Structure formats: C-alpha cells, structure tokens
Regions:
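Non-catalytic, solvent-exposed segments at the cell envelope interface
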Residues: 1-289
C-alpha cells in the first residue's frame, strides 16, 4: 500500500497517526475455516472495523470510526487505473470507500473528512487476526455481561476468560446482540485490541524480532501495511495501543450528532476540535459517543 498515491493530503501535525483497519478478507481460508469462524463466503473484501490511533507526547488516543459513518467521497486517483476521478459531493458509508477503490481511497476519504493526515496504514483480515490471537496463546478478557449472536458465532458468559482466535473474532464482530449496534461493537473492538496489546507489547517481544516476527507472521497472509512501515513502526504501534488503557491514554468513538439517510452523522464542531487537538498533540478533551 503506497500512501504517496493519495492526493491533496492535509499537512502533517505533531505525533504519529495510524489508520488501523480490520477487513473481511477470506484470503487463504478453506471452506471449513469460513464455517468455523462464521465469516460467510462473500467475494472481495470490505472493512469490518476502522480506527485512528494517535501516538504523541500526551498519551495515545484511539478513535473508532463506525463503518456506517456518513462521509463525502472526494476526488481521487484510481489505485489501478491511475485515472483522476473528480469529487461530486457524493455521500455514502465510510466502508464503501474501501469497497470502491481499496486502502488508498479509504485513506483519502478519512483525510478529506477529518483534515487529519494519516502517517501509517495497517490492515489485517479475518484469518490473520485469528492466527495472531492463537499464536500468543489467546487473550484474557473480562466480559461484563453474557451475550449471544448467531451471525458472528458469539456465545459468551460474563466474567474473566481467555479467548482463542475463533472466539476473539466473534467478540469483535458482534453487533446485532447490542442495542447500540455498531457503536457498541466498536467499544468492544477497542477493549479487545487494548487487551491484545497488553499481552504482546512487552519489551521482550517488541525489541526481539525473533519473537515479534513469528507473532505477526501468524497473520502475514492477510496483513497489509504502507510501504514505509517497518517492524520498528509496528512495535511502536503496539506499545501505543497498550498505553491506550493506562496513564494518559484515551479511547473513544468518533463524536456522533445523529443520523442522515440511515448513516451516522459526525458532530462537526466536536470533530474539528478533536482533530485540532490531535494535530497540535494536545491532551484530548473531546468526548465521543
């Protein structure tokens, strides 16, 4: 993935901004895997989750971008055709940008609608996600309330438990079991990623490529990063993710002001203030939904 192909980019601010994407890529999965992981068998791939992780001098901030967010698709250069497509003021769900022209258009759309420059892009598919969780021996979670969801395969009791790859995927994909649907799901995704980072982001793992590479290697079949992102950058991202739940760290959903055409409409004033604080690497005082 080449960020230099993204046009009309915002100026860089202080700190580092990662766009972290979970896709529904089924690449390398057998029919048995798809059935076991409750992924379905849709062709192509779409974004199942999107987050911005800001790492700066005032602690990391993790912001979930609901896939049903109402956004404007701006002008862009086709990732394969090289042709420039003009912006026509067309509004759609955020995850449609990825479906239309992949990571480059998703980054372009996020930057256009937020004004925040993305420094690094990280994407992982279903099988890779489950593989990484299994590679570290599972992730311990404290689930406050029992829930079930046939679509994702989730069936959890309340309390502390260690989730394997299959269970972890079901946990982060569940939306229909919650009243808030996508907004509740993004909160669970944040909790899980923080727990995953707490177990993987230790100096013994991050600073030792012989330990870090096998851990990430379990997901390499479906791992996509921008061409300038190395192992050190991935390690820094894991450390920042770990810090989200401690000290000055903060996790939130993008501030929402209501709905439009069935999509979630961002609160423009709050988003503008949030982006300004991130650009200046100031403590985030804005709250999300």
């Amino acid at each position: 993935m080449d960020l230099s192909k993204v046009i009309d980019r915002p100026e860089a601010g202080d700190g580092t901004n990662y766009l972290i994407v979970g896709s529904d890529s089924r690449e390398g999965m057998s029919d048995e895997d798809k059935k076991k992981l409750h992924t379905g068998s849709a062709e192509g791939k779409r974004t199942d989750s999107m987050m911005i992780l800001h790492d700066g001098s005032n602690g990391p901030t993790l912001i979930s971008l609901p896939r049903d967010s109402d956004v404007e698709i701006p002008s862009f250069v086709g990732s394969k055709s090289g042709k420039k497509y003009p912006g026509r003021g067309r509004h759609t769900k955020l995850n449609a940008a990825y479906a239309e022209d992949g990571p480059e258009l998703l980054v372009r759309t996020v930057e256009h609608n937020t004004g925040l420059r993305i420094d690094h892009y990280v994407e992982i598919g279903f099988a890779g996600f489950a593989g990484i969780v299994d590679a570290i021996g599972g992730v311990e979670m404290d689930i406050p309330k029992a829930f079930k969801d046939k679509k994702s395969g989730a069936d959890f009791q309340a309390g502390k438990q260690t989730l394997n790859g299959e269970q972890a995927l079901a946990f982060v994909r569940t939306r229909y079991a919650f009243a808030g649907s996508d907004l509740d799901r993004t909160k669970n995704q944040q909790k899980f990623l923080a727990a995953l980072a707490n177990q993987t982001a230790t100096p013994a793992t991050i600073l030792n490529p012989f330990k870090l590479y096998p851990t990430l290697g379990a997901g390499l079949d479906t791992l996509v990063v921008d061409k300038d992102m190395g192992l050190f950058d991935l390690g820094s991202m894991f450390f920042a993710m770990k810090g989200v739940t401690g000290g000055d760290g903060k996790s939130m959903n993008m501030p929402i002001a209501g709905t439009v055409g069935g999509n979630l409409r961002w609160d423009k004033a709050k988003v503008a203030k949030l982006v300004d604080q991130l650009k200046k690497d100031e403590p985030v005082t804005v709250s999300g939904n």
